[in-house]
């Protein structure tokens, strides 16, 4: 049926986030009013709200790409990447321990308070970079307790989208993350070169404050009062605070267990790659600051295309599971290419493959969301984010240790290409950690082969028969969702990119 209320000038994919394209309870407005005016925000919850929050947070950190390398090297001149791995390891461990609790609390108390808390504490260390580097790195480690913005954001999006819409919505959110990295490192590098690192830190701090103000003023609460299992005054069981108890629950569901193992084995090398790759490009391959910024921008732009244009098409044509497998295949290829590559053009070519591998995370997030009830989205995404947080700690330490074992310290900021004392000159494997990472992703690929393509019927029927199920799954489509992969309905692609004058939404 046609959506007469939507402006022709508005893009079609807004219907994914609009309550007109979802089965939103009519009493959402009154529920928000009952929760307090500060929860209301502007308009209805939408992908726009989630994407803007993610964009500002990672834009602020993207500005610090160049200053971060400088401060890290100056603070830890010896064994730089081993120390970086230790710092990130503490942060990742704390994220792993806290993510399930924050997800469970957001299922009870709503998403907005925890969006505000996660962004505030994640960005809190930024101004300390120029005040006291030791406090800065110490606070980065401690901030891992709240570094779970993605899990809250994905639970936020799941509250107002139908199952077959979520991977598209998740793709847009993930693409926004990539978009924030397209320009922010270049801007940060320019400001650092011309005005000094202090101005970069100041700008990043202001962007973080803008993000906090946006959440406080503009972001509406997405979780209806009717779906919350408890009230603000209810106590939370300590079992919900135990991440290992959450993992035990995961072990009871073979599908979720396989997904979590896939996430761990795929994100472990990815986290290590993110922590060391830019210095690797600079020191071993010989990239200067301008080339590194251009490389980040290229991969970011291609990632946006992959997560918006290609992800939707792949989900419709291949299904959820096969899209995950394809993303893992791209990840294996790009890591192997980085491992064997020794020329600059090889890095650029592998970067295009790396951009295509970015479809894995939104596809996996949609898969885990599909296997969770509507009142357990925060817990489900929290478990996945906790595993990713653990990888954020183990990955950098693993890569730093492998570089150390191969006598590559990467502790200097200047490029060492063609240097006589470079141990990698003439080496058969210039990047050992990346090749090792490709082997780990191969294991992830083999595990993902055993993930069932479709959701369990019993779980969906229970979901449809519950009162909370009406938030995300319309009763008239309940039986159809049991046998459809995400985004199998071709109308979702039409929602995203059909000409504005020919808008038609099929419900």
Swiss-Prot record:
<feature type="glycosylation site" description="N-linked (GlcNAc...) asparagine">
    <location>
        <position position="464"/>
    </location>
</feature>
<feature type="transmembrane region" description="Helical">
    <location>
        <begin position="137"/>
        <end position="157"/>
    </location>
</feature>
<keyword id="KW-0472">Membrane</keyword>
<dbReference type="InterPro" id="IPR005829">
    <property type="entry name" value="Sugar_transporter_CS"/>
</dbReference>
<keyword id="KW-0812">Transmembrane</keyword>
<feature type="transmembrane region" description="Helical">
    <location>
        <begin position="85"/>
        <end position="105"/>
    </location>
</feature>
<feature type="region of interest" description="Disordered">
    <location>
        <begin position="459"/>
        <end position="483"/>
    </location>
</feature>
<feature type="transmembrane region" description="Helical">
    <location>
        <begin position="324"/>
        <end position="344"/>
    </location>
</feature>
<feature type="topological domain" description="Cytoplasmic">
    <location>
        <begin position="345"/>
        <end position="347"/>
    </location>
</feature>
<feature type="transmembrane region" description="Helical">
    <location>
        <begin position="431"/>
        <end position="451"/>
    </location>
</feature>
<feature type="transmembrane region" description="Helical">
    <location>
        <begin position="52"/>
        <end position="72"/>
    </location>
</feature>
<feature type="topological domain" description="Extracellular">
    <location>
        <begin position="220"/>
        <end position="257"/>
    </location>
</feature>
<dbReference type="GO" id="GO:0022857">
    <property type="term" value="F:transmembrane transporter activity"/>
</dbReference>
<keyword id="KW-1133">Transmembrane helix</keyword>
<dbReference type="GO" id="GO:0016020">
    <property type="term" value="C:membrane"/>
</dbReference>
<dbReference type="Pfam" id="PF07690">
    <property type="entry name" value="MFS_1"/>
</dbReference>
<feature type="transmembrane region" description="Helical">
    <location>
        <begin position="258"/>
        <end position="278"/>
    </location>
</feature>
<dbReference type="InterPro" id="IPR001958">
    <property type="entry name" value="Tet-R_TetA/multi-R_MdtG-like"/>
</dbReference>
<feature type="topological domain" description="Extracellular">
    <location>
        <begin position="158"/>
        <end position="170"/>
    </location>
</feature>
<feature type="topological domain" description="Extracellular">
    <location>
        <begin position="305"/>
        <end position="323"/>
    </location>
</feature>
<comment type="similarity">
    <text>Belongs to the major facilitator superfamily.</text>
</comment>
<feature type="transmembrane region" description="Helical">
    <location>
        <begin position="390"/>
        <end position="410"/>
    </location>
</feature>
<feature type="topological domain" description="Extracellular">
    <location>
        <begin position="1"/>
        <end position="51"/>
    </location>
</feature>
<feature type="topological domain" description="Extracellular">
    <location>
        <begin position="106"/>
        <end position="113"/>
    </location>
</feature>
<feature type="transmembrane region" description="Helical">
    <location>
        <begin position="171"/>
        <end position="191"/>
    </location>
</feature>
<feature type="topological domain" description="Cytoplasmic">
    <location>
        <begin position="192"/>
        <end position="198"/>
    </location>
</feature>
<keyword id="KW-0325">Glycoprotein</keyword>
<feature type="transmembrane region" description="Helical">
    <location>
        <begin position="284"/>
        <end position="304"/>
    </location>
</feature>
<feature type="topological domain" description="Cytoplasmic">
    <location>
        <begin position="411"/>
        <end position="430"/>
    </location>
</feature>
<feature type="glycosylation site" description="N-linked (GlcNAc...) asparagine">
    <location>
        <position position="465"/>
    </location>
</feature>
<feature type="transmembrane region" description="Helical">
    <location>
        <begin position="114"/>
        <end position="134"/>
    </location>
</feature>
<protein>
    <recommendedName>
        <fullName>Hippocampus abundant transcript-like protein 1</fullName>
    </recommendedName>
</protein>
<keyword id="KW-0813">Transport</keyword>
<feature type="region of interest" description="Disordered">
    <location>
        <begin position="1"/>
        <end position="27"/>
    </location>
</feature>
<dbReference type="InterPro" id="IPR036259">
    <property type="entry name" value="MFS_trans_sf"/>
</dbReference>
<feature type="transmembrane region" description="Helical">
    <location>
        <begin position="348"/>
        <end position="368"/>
    </location>
</feature>
<feature type="topological domain" description="Extracellular">
    <location>
        <begin position="369"/>
        <end position="389"/>
    </location>
</feature>
<feature type="topological domain" description="Extracellular">
    <location>
        <begin position="452"/>
        <end position="507"/>
    </location>
</feature>
<dbReference type="InterPro" id="IPR020846">
    <property type="entry name" value="MFS_dom"/>
</dbReference>
<feature type="topological domain" description="Cytoplasmic">
    <location>
        <begin position="135"/>
        <end position="136"/>
    </location>
</feature>
<feature type="topological domain" description="Cytoplasmic">
    <location>
        <begin position="73"/>
        <end position="84"/>
    </location>
</feature>
<dbReference type="InterPro" id="IPR011701">
    <property type="entry name" value="MFS"/>
</dbReference>
